[in-house]
UniProtKB/Swiss-Prot annotation:
Descriptive protein name: Spore coat protein F-like protein YgzC
Source organism phylogeny: Bacteria, Bacillati, Bacillota, Bacilli, Bacillales
Family annotation (InterPro entries): Spore_coat_CotF-like
Pfam families linked: Coat_F
Chief localisation class: other
Keyword set, alphabetical order: Sporulation
Disulfide bonds: none
Amino acid sequence: MYRSKKQSQILSYQELLKKQRRWFPIEQSLCPKDILDLLTTIKTSINKYTVATTATENPHIRRALHDQLDTAVYLHDELSDLLLEKGWLG
């Protein structure tokens, strides 16, 4: 059951990202430096979520932190793909 819920969350993130790109195209509104800064911020968040997830003992908090970690990793992947696609990172 968890995997199907997680898969549906990932699909909804993908749909949201597609809609966001259509309504607010990232490549037209931000320069490569802005996106690289965002990528660095997300990487820092991933590190902090990892530490917090392993440090907490409460399973509900751990689950919430893990979900946030998954979202941050997914967003990092999407932004990295965008940077590579545009040739801004290589």
